[in-house]
Amino acid sequence: HQLTRRQRQMCIRDSMKKGHVATLDINVLLLKHPPNKFETFEDEIQYIINHDRRNKFIRNLALDLKGNTLILFARVEGHGEPLYNLINSNSLEQRHVFFVHGGVDTEDREKVRSITENENNAIIVASYGTFSTGINIKNLHNVIFASPSKSRIRNLQSIGRILRKGSNKTKATLYDIADDISFKSRKNYTLNHLIERIKIYNEE
């Protein structure tokens, strides 16, 4: 039984009011780049996910945040692995860093779930796909959208993940990292996708 989008939004909003789910703060972090005119969407994605300073910004943000932090990416080899390696090599010993993607079997995903439900300061680097369908984590405090995503449903599913209220949580924060690489009056592809996502956030 599929809820329509309008019903789904009503459910989220009503549940927040009743206190069944955590309240959600959304921070859009718009990174300003030198103007660039990309021929294709793929060219822009490659530029973004291979951008060293951008990836280090995500690493520093994740390491600075307190609480269980989920970092969502779109491409395993292209973005997920480099991010995981960057974060894991800089993390303090007592802070666990996990890497979850479509290739990780169900048992591993369950292990990650049980760890986060027992921990309060872990970092999980995960593919959108794994989390939008597979894992429910009650004890999430922060979510970072590290890769551009234009899928409305996927964004809503990701938001739903964070909103399940843990025993010690009433507030969660979403960090949506976006990129302004506009060339003259021409907005870059992923900036247009951000504008779409902001509409969703405002509707929520």
Label each residue range with its predicted role.
Residues 67-68, 95-96, 120-122:
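Short coil/turn segments at beta-strand junctions that form active-site/ligand-binding loops
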Residues 36-74, 78-89:
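Conserved interdomain hinge at the start of the Helicase C-terminal
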